Amino acid sequence: AMPPAADGVAGVACNILKSMAPSVKVHNQWIAQAGIGIVHLPAFVLHPAPLVSGMSESEMWMGSSTVLADGAPCSSLTHPALSCNIVGIPTIPRKGKPRKVSKALLAPTSMLSTITSVGNPVLVGGPPTIDVFALAMKFGLKGLGKMWKKIGDRFQNLIDRLRKKGMNRLADILQPIKCKTFGEPVDAATGRVYHTNVDFELPGPIPVVWERTYYSDAAVDGPLGYNWHHSYNLGIRQLEEGAFAFRHADGRESFLPTLKLGESHFDRKEQLFWTLDAQGYQLTDIRGLQYRFDGRENRFGYRMVSGISTKDGFRLRFEYASGGRLAGIISSRGEFLKVETDESGRVLCVSVNQDGEEVKLVRYRYDDRGDMVETIDALDVSKHFVYSGGHLLVRLTNQGGMSFHWEYEGKGENARCVHTWGDGGVMEYFIRYGKGYTHIRNGENAETEYYYGEDKLIYKIVDANGGITRHQYNSFQELEVTVNPEGYTRKTAYNEFGQPIRITDENGEDTFLDYDGNRNLVSLYTPGGKRLSWDYDRQDRVVSRTTPGGETVKYAYDGGVLRTITDGQGRVYTLTFNDRYDLELLQFPNGLFRRWEYDGRGRLVQAVDVKGNVTRYAYDRADNLVRLEEPDGNVHRFEYDAMGNMVHASDNIREVRFTYGALGVLKSREQERHHITFGYNSELQLRRIGN
């Protein structure tokens, strides 16, 4: 078994050494670069061990201006190095005084001596230069790094204390991308039943995505009843211990430190920037969305999110009633979503006005225990939920009438799923838990074992064929190494912000990625040596993109929207948007244009091509396309089942019918008396095609 990556001193040291390893050698010896550190190694063979700690630290100061190695000026014979920081006799240690001489005493008084084992000299031409980029990064990140370290060290100790106190089970849940699930999903490491569903979406510069999430092992009351969370129940709660609890869009919680004005904190695991400015606390996520928490405080002590914005001025705004109950959302297109709640703050209905008509996007119903038992969509189609004691979900019946079931061992937050299945034995799993591993058997009698550490990260999977997949993570829970059952390895190296900078695939080929100071991807080098690059403006919008062939495409913006695109030949394409930020006209370099029209929900209803031909579209209340009229008069009609699967499609000539099975798998297709059927096993894997 491969244990998780060590978090101790040895593990950290190994990770640092690996990350520092260059990729360029001369005669099998590592090269030096401008900016690389040099450490004096005493000759222990001829001299006794030093009585004081060595301070003979140096740094390569210059390298070639025309030859780069690992992206920095390559240093060679006679290039100057910063040294001479061995100043006088070490002083007697005094309380409050530094134990080491400041690096500011470094001066360029040494030269690099080149030592190679074999081979002829390698000429490195060009006048000497410093590594300007590295120097800028040092000056730019020096103060920030010290501040993060100071805050981070202090804050990590606080997090450890909070976890020992068991502040909230939601703080122990991993991000979904880091979990391994099976069935209708169950988390392999914890036995947690985990369910998500997007109830509705609205387009816009910042789309409105109303998603709900359920965790069986976190009995927390909320705006969708116990154990359920929606994506806009975002808030921060001041803790007595000098920290904040942050409620994420998926309902999980993490901790953030209290800050002084002007301070910042970066949570690498969650990819969040936390800052305190004159307006208050602000959180910035990996997408660049900025969150402010000036909303009312809810009954659980959370200061609710008041706005979600982008750097170029788009914003979602939130309105609250007394007790921090969500009352409305104003979209980035200016639409008002009305949110109705009961006295406990539970959401009853979310609606929007569409061309003068109120459309109820989703409705919820609860039982006397505060559990959500029914959801009703825009087409008045329902899902039903049944729970056992402790708010444990035991049955879900979808819009098509099919049910999924869960059985547990234990009660409440300590319950773990031991059996899950769908009607007819679909997606059936039997689960057994051991110390540090989970054994599952599916309906096809295939067995799999998952091994995990204290952090609940899966580090080994033994599949039904005996094949072993191994994963190795770093201390930030980032996946660094995957070894598949055939023994091939995939590796990923990250920068200090947790962004991948080098990906080595199973064939040993590397992809390199570079970022700017705002964490924007600026270049990508493919295994074949091709380079793609991007440039950005102050709002982090792409203003140019250069292809491997050297062609550059440029983008210009006006008022937050894309206005022109200029291709590699200098041809300009002009885009025009309406006041709701829908693209309504595209003008080509030759003067021709295409036009689009939309309804009140932002759905395309008419498209006009460069010849003036018109195509028209119509939708149902759930945004399913039900009618398409082509320029020649041919009309396509579409019908759907309660799950949103297309069951009937026709035009002026043809007609096709479809039937579906569990989870929307296609069971049959019929056209012009030709009937094709599809058969699946209990894992919904295709096994048979008949006609």
Model-predicted regions and their roles:
Residues 1-38, 195, 205, 212-217, ...:
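N-terminal targeting and processing segments
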Residues 18-20, 26, 61-63, 69, ...:
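Short, well-ordered loop/turn elements at secondary-structure boundaries
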Residues 22, 65, 120, 198, ...:
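Residue-level detector of short, conserved catalytic/binding motifs and their immediate flanks
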Residues 23-25, 33, 67, 122, ...:
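Short aromatic-centered micro-motifs
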